[in-house]
Amino acid sequence: MHFSSFTSLLVATLAACSVASPVDVGKRGEITVGSRRADKGVCFGHDHVMWGAQIGKGVYTSPSRDGYEALAAPDAWYCVIKADQAAFDKIPKVWIPEKNKHNQRMWNQKDEKRIDEYIESLHEHPSSSLRFSIMPHGRDRSRQQMLIVPELADKKHFTIHCYEKKEDVKEGAVHYDSWHPKGEKGN
């Protein structure tokens, strides 16, 4: 699946924010919250179609710079997503398992109705919660991902810093479990 043009524009806007940022992120209380690979055009504010819709619409990230390695074009840049820690800590975080308690599939559906119902059952709002899930690749279910929904990205909680070379990325992996998302992770 491909992201909508709205989400593509959202990614481009986030990327443009990081390019214009003159302040060292370490001095603003920012933390690394995820990574992804993106074409150079996205890193510099041009519209681009991205992949994915497993747990909803938005910007998909992985905990490390290598999370989307197999899905990215060879010349894709390495992007690090950062957020102000105080603001990020206030954002609700939820795991989205593959199936709900009624054994109904939630991943890769035409709409987000079941996911929204699941998030609401955890007493959170779907449009203001970060979503986490396993990123299945065949039988390997050890990878994880985070989805930044459009409403959160629109509020400019996040900045993106992109690097042409992998070795230029100094940020280490993020540990999603340390943020204690609500809900069932699944397997």
Where are these regions (language model features)?
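Classical eukaryotic N-terminal signal peptides for Sec-dependent ER targeting/secretion
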Residues: 1-10
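Conserved NAD+-utilizing ADP-ribose enzyme module
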Residues: 13-31, 36-43, 49-57, 69-187
